[in-house]
């Protein structure tokens, strides 16, 4: 019977401890959700966070202190009945819950400060970005100081043992939340990269002219050297052309002015000679055309006379045929007479 009564008493006490722990956890969860909503809506600014961080930490410390007092009262009442294992388990759970809530609070503060820093950076430029970065660092440091003050206020032996156990469990809690912190760090890095991109894409400030090379000595020297190179090439081209012109002239000159004057005179003479030759060639062409026309008319006359002579020859042939004389016999008779005349001229004594 005693064992049953003790078991019932332990179960009721466990239920009370569990309900108290659940109430504390619900309060802390509601507080963290409210903070996250305020952070998402952008209602918290850097100044309000700087002023309210102490009160938030104090309220968090008061909540933790209340839960610790509930746990201590429950533990002291059940110290004779429950073993050391149950005490260590409840203390460990309370420490883990407190550590998680504190970490969420600090992380929410850092996120809100980062969001405020990005807004101020987009509004004010790169110079204010560095100042906001410093402000983003200071709240996290200020958030640690109230914790030390709260720890100094709790100086009882029971709380010192509780603090030592919490210190032993903090690394375990941080190890359990490692992936979440790693994800938060990656999100912060992505936010920083996006912030840098936004800053780089911002237009330049008005009223500031970009620094050009036109005012530097190096640019002036480079421009002077390029001008000298252009002038040198121009003179080289002129000298080359004058030398070629001097080679074409019949008289060799030394100075450039004499070469140009002689070239102008020589070109003028060539022009006059060309004009004279053109006139001469024109006259010759006209004469040749006239002679060609005369020769053509004479040729036509000769052709006409030859035609008439051919007609007379044909007429004489017909007459001779009528008389019984062949044209060929007459031709041979004339040939024989010519031979006789030639022989008589060669032998005058025989005649």
From Swiss-Prot:
The modification Phosphothreonine is found at residue 138. Its main location: nucleus. GO terms for biological process: cellular response to methionine; chromatin remodeling; chromosome segregation; negative regulation of ceramide biosynthetic process; negative regulation of transcription by RNA polymerase II; positive regulation of inositol biosynthetic process; positive regulation of sulfate assimilation; positive regulation of transcription by RNA polymerase II. It comes from Saccharomyces cerevisiae (strain ATCC 204508 / S288c) (Baker's yeast). This is Centromere-binding protein 1. Binds DNA as a dimer. Associates with MET4 to form a heteromeric complex which also includes MET28. Keywords: Acetylation, Centromere, Chromosome, DNA-binding, Mitochondrion, Nucleus, Phosphoprotein, Transcription, Transcription regulation. The keyword Lyase does not apply.
């Amino acid at each position: 019977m005693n064992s049953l009564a003790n078991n019932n008493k332990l179960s009721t006490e466990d239920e009370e401890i569990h309900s108290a722990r659940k109430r504390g956890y619900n309060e802390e969860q509601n507080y963290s959700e409210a903070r996250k909503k305020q952070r998402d809506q952008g209602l918290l600014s850097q100044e309000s966070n700087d002023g309210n961080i102490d009160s938030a930490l104090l309220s968090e410390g008061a909540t933790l202190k209340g839960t610790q007092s509930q746990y201590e009262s429950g533990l002291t009442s059940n110290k004779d009945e429950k073993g050391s294992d149950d005490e260590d388990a409840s203390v460990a759970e309370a420490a883990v819950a407190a550590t998680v809530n504190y970490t969420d609070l600090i992380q929410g503060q850092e996120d809100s400060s980062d969001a405020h820093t990005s807004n101020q950076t987009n509004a004010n430029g790169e110079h204010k970005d560095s100042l906001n970065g410093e402000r983003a660092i200071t709240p996290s440091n200020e958030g640690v100081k109230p914790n030390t003050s709260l720890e100094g206020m709790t100086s009882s032996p029971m709380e010192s043992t509780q603090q030592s156990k919490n210190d032993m469990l903090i690394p375990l809690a941080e190890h359990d939340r490692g992936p979440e912190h790693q994800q938060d760090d990656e999100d912060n890095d992505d936010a920083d990269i996006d912030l840098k991109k936004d800053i780089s894409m911002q237009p330049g400030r008005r009223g500031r002219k970009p620094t050009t090379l036109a005012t530097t000595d190096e640019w002036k020297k480079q421009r002077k050297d390029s001008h000298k190179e252009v002038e040198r090439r121009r003179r080289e081209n002129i000298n080359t052309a004058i030398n070629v012109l001097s080679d074409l002239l019949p008289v060799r000159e030394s100075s450039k002015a004499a070469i140009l004057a002689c070239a102008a005179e020589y070109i003028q003479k060539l022009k006059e000679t060309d004009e004279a030759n053109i006139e001469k060639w024109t006259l010759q062409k006209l004469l040749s055309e006239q002679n060609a026309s005369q020769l053509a008319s004479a040729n036509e006359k000769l052709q006409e006379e030859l035609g008439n002579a051919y007609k007379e020859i044909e007429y004489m042939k017909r007459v001779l045929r009528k008389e019984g004389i062949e044209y060929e016999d007459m031709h041979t008779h004339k040939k024989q007479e010519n031979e006789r005349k030639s022989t008589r001229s060669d032998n005058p004594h025989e005649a």
